Amino acid sequence: MKDRSSTPPLHVHVDENTPVHVHIKKLPKPSATSSQKSHKRGMKGDTVNVRRSVRVKTKVPWMPPGKSSARPVGCKWENPPHCLEITPPSSEKLVSVMRLSDLSTEDDDSGHCKMNRYDKKIDSLMNAVGCLKSEVKMQKGERQMAKRFLEERKEELEEVAHELAETEHENTVLRHNIERMKEEKDFTILQKKHLQQEKECLMSKLVEAEMDGAAAAKQVMALKDTIGKLKTEKQMTCTDINTLTRQKELLLQKLSTFGETNRTLRDLLREQHCKEDSERLMEQQGALLKRLAEADSEKARLLLLLRDKDKEVEELLQEIQCEKAQAKTASELSKSMESMRGHLQAQLRSKEAENSRLCMQIKNLERSGNQHKAEVEAIMEQLKELKQKGDRDKESLKKAIRAQKERAEKSEEYAEQLHVQLADKDLYVAEALSTLESWRSRYNQVVKDKGDLELEIIVLNDRVTDLVNQQQTLEEKMREDRDSLVERLHRQTAEYSAFKLENERLKASFAPMEDKLNQAHLEVQQLKASVKNYEGMIDNYKSQVMKTRLEADEVAAQLERCDKENKILKDEMNKEIEAARRQFQSQLADLQQLPDILKITEAKLAECQDQLQGYERKNIDLTAIISDLRSRETGGDQCPEYRVPTGDCQEGGGNPPVPAAARGENTGMWDPGKAVGERH
């Protein structure tokens, strides 16, 4: 505080509408003429401090405790007899004191209301996300329970499938046994007929042999009688010898015929047994070949079924992969929509904040324009007053004219700055329009994406319905197959029981034939060696058939597993599609509010453009006023001295200010360290 006088600081308490005019003595050092001082603005009642746009590094003057200072840039022209002080308005705030009545809180309230609405929307969205997460957790738990239940059902189905396979195996064995029994039955019927014929033939041969035996026995009896007679008579005549020789010849003849018939009978029996054995072997061979052909056809049919099932499994796997890819794309689209919504909300908030800031700046510019007009009016009034006092202050008027010229130059510079600011505002408005166009394009893109997503959802729903219908048809087919298998099983068990009873009856009827079969077993053993080879081949074919059946059972189990997995995947897809649909509906509900917000922002931008045009017109008016002032300043010595007011009001009511030349003292710049106008 070296440049100040030793006088203590002055505190002045005045009313709000009282004008204040302060004159300070000239500083002793000439270097102080180029220094810049700051005005102190009180912040009491309905007044607030306004931020300055230009800051100059100067020494801080003494301030009373508990107060803050604001440093506007001021210009001062000083000469030993006179001093003129001009404080140009800043580029952002053109008033030294701004009242609370000049500020409107409607935009702030609307901005706060919008922010509160967006916060509420965000809270509701977060709550919805939390609810969705809890639902997802519950669905996961339900899925785990369903998986456990399905695994239990799967085990039960595997057991049932194993039992069905065993029953099918038993059914096949029973079927083969029944076919064998039928074949044996047919064979026994034919054998009975053949045996009946052979029996008749044998009976005729046996009758012939008995007749030959009876004739031979008669001949032997006759021979015994003749021999007995000869023993009793002990004399043999020629007739006796002839009869004896004749009977001997007849006996030999009868014995030879009996031997021939016996031999032929044995040959017939042997041929009959050989025929029976060969026929039995041929029938067994035919049955084996028939079984082999049936096994080959069954194997081919199972291979075709396996190929068809493999194709169906591949198609189902491809469909599952396609559904997974579609679900993945749907989840990615939902994530991108979430990020786009957050980005749009952030942009809307930033644009609303920027719009509110622009509105405040525009209002401040309006206030500064009004203040400038008031200053110009005050200057004009002072010019009128100074014209009356021009005779006494000619010399000070010349200096004032110079200062006015410099001030006019400063005002021109300020007008140029305003032009630059207006150009910047135009650029900002153009940028805002471009951002609006980009928002419109984004909104159109979002609407287009919404339509695409709706189409995809419709396609997915159709696909899911088709898959559900296919699943229902497959389930119905499997149910029908199971019912038919159960019916066949019951029918075959009934047939098996009937065949068993018939077999027992046939066994009882075949008891007399077992003796003959025992005789044939000796000859059958010779053929067992050849039969073993066929049995080995049959075992190989049986093992192959068993392998094919096991493979078919495995394929059936795999198909059942695939069906179950398809059911699970379909359920999951339905749940994910419902969740994605809900998310898309919520997002669409949020996005439907964007056109209203965009319309509001467009209306605000249009108002800003209108206000900017009004400011341009005001700027033109101000330039016209400045040109008029210049033309008046060219009048030279005819214009009196005038001074710019330092505040909103001047001290002393309506009395005109006393010129410095009349008082006989030098004027200085208004120093808040020596005289302060405070409002409490």
From Swiss-Prot:
Q: What InterPro entries does UniProt report for this protein, alphabetically?
A: Odf2-rel (IPR026099)
Sites of the modification Phosphothreonine?
A: T87, T105, T226
Q: List residues modified as Phosphoserine.
A: S68, S69, S90, S101, S104, S110, S124, S134, S256, S627
**Major subcellular site:** cytoplasm
Q: Which UniProt keywords apply?
A: Cell projection, Cilium, Coiled coil, Cytoplasm, Cytoskeleton, Developmental protein, Differentiation, Flagellum, Isopeptide bond, Microtubule, Phosphoprotein, Spermatogenesis, Ubl conjugation
> How the protein assembles, per its UniProt entry?
Self-associates. Associates with microtubules and forms a fibrillar structure partially linked to the microtubule network. Interacts via its C-terminus with PLK1. Interacts with ODF1. Interacts with MARK4; the interaction is required for localization of ODF2 to centrioles. Interacts with TSSK4. Interacts with AKNA. Interacts with QRICH2. Interacts with CFAP58. Interacts with BBOF1. Interacts with CCDC38. Interacts with CCDC42.
This one is known as Outer dense fiber protein 2
